């Protein structure tokens, strides 16, 4: 999975928006490897494209990503210290360049291990399954 990082020798300052996106990716998929993390980032990009809002606004929309339910940035910044954070920050920095086709332009997903599917997934067929996440285009 190619992510464009630009000049690898520059030091980047991480913006608040990039932190929000990276934390969302980490909270949702850090155990899913690079493919799973890319997939979640692609869903964020797809929602931003469809809803005409920024990717960080997508992440913070009420009840969209459970990691943010009742939490603030300071409560979750510790995730930026896990080994997968470097890749998540790279995805966050380049979110508008990601291939949304990677997940079939999916705008929803859920963990496949959930005992009960979310209400919106009932009767829907996933466009893709990557790791332990099923992806849907609704």
Regions found by a protein language model. Give the residues of each.
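Bacterial extracytoplasmic/cell-wall-associated proteins, especially those involved in peptidoglycan
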Residues: 4-138
């Amino acid at each position: 999975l190619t992510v464009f990082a630009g000049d690898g020798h520059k030091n980047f300052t991480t913006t608040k928006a990039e932190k929000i996106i990276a934390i969302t990716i980490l909270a949702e998929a850090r155990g899913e490897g690079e493919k799973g993390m890319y997939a979640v980032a692609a869903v964020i990009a797809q929602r931003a494209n469809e809803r005409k809002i920024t990717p960080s606004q997508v992440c913070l929309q009420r009840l969209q990503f459970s990691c943010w339910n009742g939490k603030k940035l300071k409560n979750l910044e510790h995730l930026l210290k896990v080994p997968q954070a470097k890749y998540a920050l790279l995805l966050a920095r380049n979110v508008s360049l990601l291939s949304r086709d990677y997940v079939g332009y999916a705008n929803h997903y859920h963990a496949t291990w959930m005992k009960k599917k979310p209400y919106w997934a009932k009767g829907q067929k996933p466009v893709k399954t990557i790791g332990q996440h099923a992806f849907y285009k609704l």
